[in-house]
Amino acid sequence: MSNEATVIKVTGQSVNENYDVVVGRGLLDTLPAKLGERVRRVLVIHPRALRLTGDTVRDELEAAGFTALTAEIPDAEEGKHIQVAAFCWQVLGQNDFTRSDAIVAVGGGAVTDLAGFVAATWLRGVKVIHMPTSLLGMVDASVGGKTGINTAEGKNLVGSFHPPAAVLADLDTLQTLPKNELISGMAEVIKCGFIADPAILDLVEKNTDAVMDPGSDVVRELIERAISVKADVVSQDLKESGLREILNYGHTLGHAIELVERYSWRHGAAVSVGMMFAAELSRSVGRLSDADADRHRTILESLGLPITYRRDRWQGLLDGMRRDKKSRGDLLRFVVLDGVAKPGILEVPDTSLLFAAYQEIAS
């Protein structure tokens, strides 16, 4: 595959919803141009684990003539709290950031979620550019304009829609990504295969070894295909009024697992179990064939992703699912499949149906 950057366009209903997702290598030197001439001050938000990377981005911006600062936040989901957002707001205020200044997020999905939320709320909206450093961040969190923080009541219950000005997915950053993080991100890639692009599933099934090599052409193609799926969906439905709900395949139970586990589970692992549950639910109501449901099990297991969860946690999971944003009143709603790349919605008035499907994945 070519070393040239691939540009995937996200288009929306207004000019502020249009942006490029750039996939390639050595993309840091393109950041100043993406920020534009009007920006003077830039806050680089990064997690503790990426302090050196954050400093490198800051130094690059300083060399290009920007006034650049860094804000270091806790790693992973620990960074997605209102207190962390308040810390970032304080830094912005103390350094006189105006509406024409910008934020750059450097890190995984949790960092882009938090930085996007800070950008959306500071002065009711400033420019943000995402530089995702994890597979999960590249294919999911950084694309689509969703921002959010967690509360004691659940994940991403507080947030807004705030599309970035650009996303720079630098594949070089994946070279140092821990294997379990790579596997976690693959769950979101697989999700895109099941809801929209069967070629993703074929690639994974035929190239299991290459899928675990972040430098391979296969991984790059998987990333570009997954981003293209999400870009196409959010271009049609930014604010999740209809079509965008399909991107939540596996997430209703997945988010409930994360809540029950107090966010100690990786997002992709929880979504993997959630997809297996959704497949069993789809099968149980006659919407998904045995072969397609079993294909979930085979593909997810081949990557080392979990497909079962504890039998004794059902009530806690049910409570968590009732807080899902797709719910309408007391009615639980799930993204299900009528076949590969044929997503739909199932409204479930009777939780006994859910319990029966859960027994198929309970351990």
Curated annotation (Swiss-Prot):
Keyword hit for Metal-binding: yes
Comment on bound cofactor: Binds 1 divalent metal cation per subunit. Can use either Co(2+) or Zn(2+).
GO biological process, one term: chorismate biosynthetic process
The organism's place on the tree of life at top rank: Bacteria
EC number(s) given by UniProt: 4.2.3.4
Record carries keyword Transmembrane: no
Cofactor(s) essential for the protein: Co(2+); Zn(2+); NAD(+)
InterPro entries linked: Dehydroquinate_synthase (IPR050071), DHQ_synth_AroB (IPR016037), DHQ_synth_fam (IPR030963), DHQS/DOIS_N (IPR030960), DHQS_C (IPR056179)
Binding site for Zn(2+): E188, H251, H267
Keywords carried by this UniProt record: Amino-acid biosynthesis, Aromatic amino acid biosynthesis, Cobalt, Cytoplasm, Lyase, Metal-binding, NAD, Nucleotide-binding, Zinc
Enzyme class: lyase
Compartments in which it is found: Cytoplasm
UniProt-annotated binding residues for NAD(+): 75-80, 109-113, 133-134, 146, 155, 173-176
Reaction equation(s) it catalyzes: 7-phospho-2-dehydro-3-deoxy-D-arabino-heptonate = 3-dehydroquinate + phosphate
Gene Ontology molecular-function annotations: 3-dehydroquinate synthase activity; metal ion binding; nucleotide binding
Biological or metabolic pathway of the protein: Metabolic intermediate biosynthesis; chorismate biosynthesis; chorismate from D-erythrose 4-phosphate and phosphoenolpyruvate: step 2/7
Coiled coil stretches, renumbered: none
GO cellular component, one term: cytoplasm
Predominant subcellular localization, coarse grouping: cytoplasm
Assigned protein family: Belongs to the sugar phosphate cyclases superfamily. Dehydroquinate synthase family.
Classification via NCBIfam families: aroB
Protein name listed in UniProt: 3-dehydroquinate synthase
Organism per entry: Paenarthrobacter aurescens (strain TC1)
